[in-house]
Amino acid sequence: MSLLKDFSYHTVCFALMKIVRTGNLSKQIKSLTELEIVSRNSPINKIGDNKKATFEINDNLLRFYFTFIYKNASALQVLGAEAFYDEYVAPTLTDFISRRFEGICRDYFSLQVRSGKLKGVRNIGSYYYDDPVHRKNGEFDVALELADGYAIYEAKYYAQPMTLDEIRREAQQVANIKELAVKQLGFIAINGFVEQEKPYTYLDGNDIFAGM
């Protein structure tokens, strides 16, 4: 976040808290985006759909503060750091980190394209899907737009290696989306895999961080 270094964290936090308190998003979000404090993200298949767009804080420290501390500051004062961590942070910390891991995986593919190691990629992001048969919608974590379809990767920040049953469930979920032209399906598991089967692509944490 190149421009954030010119501003104190107190200044940035004040600006973000003003948005949270007043709900006056439209007047503030442009400035925060220009300063690279927040970024606007859209699924690569819904670029022009404002309803599918989200804004997220780029800086990890600020993200942590507004996720865990901002709404619970009084509890932190009463409980102390250790008890506060056990009650408010620990139960959802893995989910917090896993969302950052998804971003790291997208950055990995971006670097692969920039370095010339990966060809034919037109865009990188997430993919929004709507599954009317099973009455559910959501996003696939990592999507690479190709000329004739998509490469889809499911990123998993698991404490244990990903199992074959989990792989098959994820693969079936992708297969259920009839509108999606999948040219390559892959899995990224921070701690690797218990077992692998064709025709999928597999990457673990070592692969991702070695390529960064």
Report residues per predicted region.
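Conserved nucleotide-binding/hydrolysis micro-motifs of P-loop NTPases
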Residues: 45, 158-159, 192-194
